[in-house]
Amino acid sequence: LLLHYEVSNALRTTLELEQILYIILTAVTSHEGLGFNRAMLFLVNDKDKMLEGKMGIGPHNIEEATHIWKGIEENKMALEDLINAYDNFKRDPNSRLHNLVKSIRIHLNESQGVIALTALEGMPFEVITEEARLSSEDKYLQMMGTKYFVTAPLKAKDKVVGVVLADNIFTQKPITKADVGM
């Protein structure tokens, strides 16, 4: 409930789409939130019938992950502090994960993989076993280096407007049914 309260309060402070998306992804990755290592957001472009990479939050490699998480721990940063770091995120043109995600365009077609399927079906997918991973291989997942992950549609008035993908690529912490249900 505290997570919901903090995110709701943060969302009430802005009308800027980029900042709203940042708040959502920060809640997905924060140790006080859902605690995933990375979160990526793809928005639906109805005109071109595509998903377009919009934002990526999280480290690009294990060294960066260690550095970031150590800084969060040393500075005792809470979810609110991480949300308030939006201006730093906005000014960092060197975020490799963010730039990688922004370079991705996925046709809204079943053959394009699980990210496209999430948007088309309007339901979450969990790739948390080896069997599921082998059946969901696609070039976009390979680009991001992700093996086990969850996806969830982002909806507005029952219409899918985007897809969030989250993984634990660095900690290799198993993604459980409880994580997916949060």
Locate the predicted segments by residue.
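Flexible loop/coil segments at beta-strand boundaries within sensory signal-transduction domains
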Residues: 133, 155-160, 169
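Helix-loop-beta substructure at the N-terminus of cytosolic sensory domains
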Residues: 13-65
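A short, aliphatic-rich beta-strand micro-motif
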Residues: 147-156
